[in-house]
Every structure is written in C-alpha cells, then in structure tokens.
Amino acid sequence: MAKLTVKDVDLKGKKVLVRVDFNVPLKDGVITNDNRITAALPTIKYIIEQGGRAILFSHLGRVKEEADKEGKSLAPVAADLAAKLGQDVVFPGVTRGAKLEEAINALEDGQVLLVENTRFEDVDGKKESKNDEELGKYWASLGDGIFVNDAFGTAHRAHASNVGISANVEKAVAGFLLENEIAYIQEAVETPERPFVAILGGSKVSDKIGVIENLLEKADKVLIGGGMTYTFYKAQGIEIGNSLVEEDKLDVAKDLLEKSNGKLILPVDSKEANAFAGYTEVRDTEGEAVSEGFLGLDIGPKSIAEFDQALTGAKTVVWNGPMGVFENPDFQAGTIGVMDAIVKQPGVKSIIGGGDSAAAAINLGRADKFSWISTGGGASMELLEGKVLPGLAALTEK
C-alpha cells in the first residue's frame, strides 16, 4: 500500500485525530457485539504508547432528525473502550463547541478522548454524510496536523470525519486495521496465489453484479450460492417454484453466465421448504429444479460435495455471502459445508468479506479458522469490485 501509515509519523506530544469504526449493535443501551471496538485497539494503543493524545471519531447508526439521537450516543462505547484499554476515556458528549475544545486542550500524552457520534451532525443539513467543508475543517483544527483513518467500514464513503478531515491536515495516514484490510482483500484479488476461488452468496444478484464481473476476470472459479442462485436458474429456464427471483436481472444473469467461460459454478440441488416461515415440509431437491409450491432456502448436499471438490487445492479463497438462510438451523448446512471446505485446504489464504458471512462464521464457531474477516461489508464489496475507496484515496502518499 503506497500510503503513509501510522508508523510513518511522529506522534509524541501530538493531538492525533483518529477515525475509528465503533458502529456497534446496541440493545437497550448495551453493546451486543464489540468486535469493532476490539479491532481498533492496536492502533489506539500504538498512538498512546508513542505518547500521542488520541482523539477518536466514529458514527453509530443512522441519524437524520433530532428524535433519531435517542439511543445513539457513544457513551456505552466510551465505557467499553475504557475497560478494554484499562484507562479512562474522556467523553465530553458533544461533536463541537467549547466543551469539546476545552476537554481536548486538557489532554495529556497517552490519554484518549472520544467525540460524540459524528452523525449527530446530520440532523442539521447532513453535514457529516455530505462531507460539509466547514465541518471537516473544524474537526481537523482540533488536532496537530495528523489524521489516522482506521475505519475500513466507512472507507467507501466520503464523509466529513474521514475525507473532510484528511483534506485539512498535513498528514493523513492509515491505521493498522485499515492497512490489514487493504492488504488482505486487495492482494487477494490483484495478486492472488492460485488457484483462486471466489464464493458469492446472499439473496440478490443486483448487489453483486460488479463483484461477479470483476472476479470472473481475476478468479479461477466463482461459486454462486444463496438466494441469487434462483435468478441464475430462471435465466436458464430452470423451474424455481416460489423461490426468490429478481425478474429485472434475468438478462444480466444470462449475460454473466455466457461470458463466464465456465468459471461460474452454480449449485446442482437445493434444500427446499413449502414456506419461508411456518413451513411443514423440508426436503432436498432431486436436481436443480425447485418443486411447485416450494422455495429453495439453502444449497443441497450434492452442491456441498461439488463445492468441496471445486475448492480442493485452492490457495486463495474470498467468500462473501451465505449459501442459505443460515440463521435457521434447517438451512445452515450449506454455509457450514462451504466454510469447512475452505478452512481445511492446506496453506490456504481465506478471507471473509464482512457482513452476513462474518456473522455466519462467528455464530457457527468457525471465525478463528479464517486468515482474515473483514470489518466492513460495503467497503469490502467495493474493493472486490475493483473500485477506489474515497477514504483510502484521501490518505497521504508515501
């Protein structure tokens, strides 16, 4: 990565502005999954160990109007972070003004401050989300010319708290998490050790058109599972019963199949049920076709065996999107089968592209077996598409 990183700058005695991704799930004010906080610790610890004063920025949820602020304060995050760091985290509870400035100016070397939810600035004219110039300049003025972007999860967005600050500081650098995300995902796609197999699941072809097109050029095989299977089936005239289908994407699916040169591998059977919820019958299909009155909710046992075979000997695997409705034990065999097939390959570099796949690996107890699990669903998807991420482009070149 030809961008400056946090190790390339002198931090001692400096007020260092840091964009982290603390967009964690909350239930009744309690954090239900703190992985994103844990993921940011190496960068925060490095800054304070080097004698810097860390000033952290993050969003939490979507905030469009005053009422949306309810339950979206970063206060629970400040408490969780303090416990993880073993030291106080200053939390003024505001995004601008004298209270914030005084708290920042009172910081000593090695201390940490968390600014309130950056999206609270969206209530008045979407200043954060629309990268308001004045807001970016103001936030940049709170530091000493160094900005560390460690929020991969928002790197595909041009917001005031990443691109806006970057434009108004002397040096904008990557944190360790951002550096790792780029290294794993970009290197896997651009310079993979072969055979390189991509596995794409999820419900919609429309979400993954760009990704499929890019990966058909780069990968040796692209395996398709999940709900989007049935759009590809229907495009070939295969019966899909009541399965999910995007009628307006049938031509796209047909086109992708035609230009794939046999690289695109579809399931050969499904696990079907007579309803999505409240079903009374679940069974495996004989072949590709889904029965009338039924819908496909997972790939079937023959497909699991075929995908296992397709993954044999793979040295690089990128997986994005579950094979079925994995939240339901009746339809998680496909996702489990594919995960197990990936991680058993000797010397494989295995990467999960965030989102539902990451949740599946964590919930089904296989997270620690993968080389890398991305923290950003949307951002990793755009990298897999070969797009330039605004948050990354805004960093200072080496």
Curated annotation (Swiss-Prot):
Protein's UniProt keywords contain Kinase: yes
Major enzyme class: transferase
Pathway entry: Carbohydrate degradation; glycolysis; pyruvate from D-glyceraldehyde 3-phosphate: step 2/5
Swiss-Prot/TrEMBL catalytic activity: (2R)-3-phosphoglycerate + ATP = (2R)-3-phospho-glyceroyl phosphate + ADP
GO biological process, one term: gluconeogenesis
Residues at which ATP binds: K208, G296, E327, G354, G355, D356, S357
SUPFAM superfamilies reported for this sequence: Phosphoglycerate kinase (SSF53748)
UniProt key word Kinase: yes
Cellular localisation: Cytoplasm
GO molecular function, one term: phosphoglycerate kinase activity
EC number: 2.7.2.3
InterPro entries named in the record: Phosphoglycerate_kinase (IPR001576), Phosphoglycerate_kinase_CS (IPR015911), Phosphoglycerate_kinase_N (IPR015824), Phosphoglycerate_kinase_sf (IPR036043)
HAMAP family in the cross-refs: Phosphoglyc_kinase
Listed name of the protein: Phosphoglycerate kinase
Organism of provenance: Streptococcus pyogenes serotype M49 (strain NZ131)
Organism ancestry: Bacteria, Bacillati, Bacillota, Bacilli, Lactobacillales
